[in-house]
Amino acid sequence: ITRLWDPAEPVVQTDSELVRQRGEINEMRMLLVRKLRATFPEQFIGGIQDSPYAQTQCPDLILSEHSTWKRIYLHRMKHSKICIASTGLHQSSGWKIAEYLAAGRAIVSEPLCYEVPGPFQAGENYLTYTSADGCIEQIRTLLAHPEQILQMGQRNRAYYDEWLRPDQIVTKALEQAKILL
């Protein structure tokens, strides 16, 4: 499940870079969903969240309201072997990556633009893509090697337990604060 960003929002209109960035994100997301549906029609579960803007751009890709309920999304994500992440606004990594880690899923993602704590590495915790075709190739690689899906999922759950679980975040912040005091 992904969303489109409306480049006509008034707050965006004052910043041509934001308009450009939103357009690129939207184009990549629509292309990705189209190609994933075409390439993996029996396996891919995903689409675009409904919005007035999405209705004008890709009505064929919009998911039903029921499909976007958090409970349904989490159930589907927890029962998927491979989860896909795309870059968000300001080159951010979506919170979905943390959800995928907590669930111990294999991840295929656009390259991360920001540093994350601990040993979280491309090739080990996630495979990267820079195009829709690249995403499909990474998924095919994982599907051809089920042991890699399992191993990546195990590494990701271990990473979550060590670095992202709320108690670990607090503990590490307190440890860091002692160093700085």
Residue ranges and their predicted role:
Residues 59-64, 72-181:
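Catalytic binding pocket for nucleotide-activated donors in carbohydrate/polymer assembly enzymes
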Residues 1-91, 109-118:
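Nucleotide-sugar donor-binding catalytic core of glycosyltransferases
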